[in-house]
Design a protein with these regions (language model features):
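Acetyl-CoA-dependent GNAT
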Residues: 3, 10-11, 18-73, 79
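Residue-level recognition of the GNAT/N-acetyltransferase active site
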Residues: 9, 66, 84, 88, ...
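Alpha-helical elements of Rossmann-like donor-binding domains used by nucleotide-donor carbohydrate transfer enzymes
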Residues: 15-19, 35-36, 95, 99, ...
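Conserved acetyl-CoA-binding loop-helix of GNAT-fold acetyltransferases
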Residues: 80, 89-102, 126, 130
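Conserved GNAT acetyl-CoA-binding A-motif
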Residues: 104-116
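Conserved acetyl-CoA-binding loop of GNAT-fold acetyltransferases
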Residues: 109, 128-138
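Conserved beta-strand-loop-alpha-helix junction that forms the acyl-donor binding cleft
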Residues: 113-124, 143
């Protein structure tokens, strides 16, 4: 089946509400997602792509460039990766990851990285490991 990966657009808002809600565990309103799209449009480093197959949005990839202060290098950060539940295990996530890695190469990045939370070891962490990613540390968060 043919597919395309393209930048997210306002027409995608209903599907984006669903996918981002699945990922975050929170309900997002169309106004929330419209705000996020506006932020991405105004950002010099953030990008949001959709995987579309047969005119149906099936997956979502958030990507941004991270410049390092401590060394002269940059990385591509995969900030969002999710597919519709019925599309999991069908290669959509792999295609989106490959797209992100190529985008990072095209922008002169040293590599790609992502953050994946606890409780996702059975699916997401195994998926990332199969793609060649290695766990290198922890993220520490303090609510304010």
């Amino acid at each position: 089946m043919e597919f395309m990966i393209r930048k997210a657009e306002p027409k995608d808002i209903p599907d984006l509400c669903f996918l981002l809600g699945e990922l975050s565990g929170h309900t997002l309103t169309p106004a929330d997602v419209e705000d996020r799209l506006r932020m991405i449009e105004e950002s010099a480093i953030d990008e949001l792509y959709v995987y579309e197959q047969e005119n149906t949005l099936q997956g979502l990839l958030g990507f941004r460039i991270r410049e390092n202060v401590e060394e002269p290098s940059r990385y591509g950060e995969i900030s969002v990766l999710i597919t519709k539940p019925e599309m999991r295990q069908l290669g959509v996530g792999r295609v989106l990851m490959e797209f992100a890695e190529q985008r990072a190469r095209d922008l002169g990045c040293k590599g790609t990285w992502l953050v994946s939370g606890f409780g996702r070891e059975e699916e997401a962490h195994k998926f990332y490991t199969r793609l060649g990613y290695k766990a290198t540390g922890y993220r520490f968060v303090k609510p304010l």
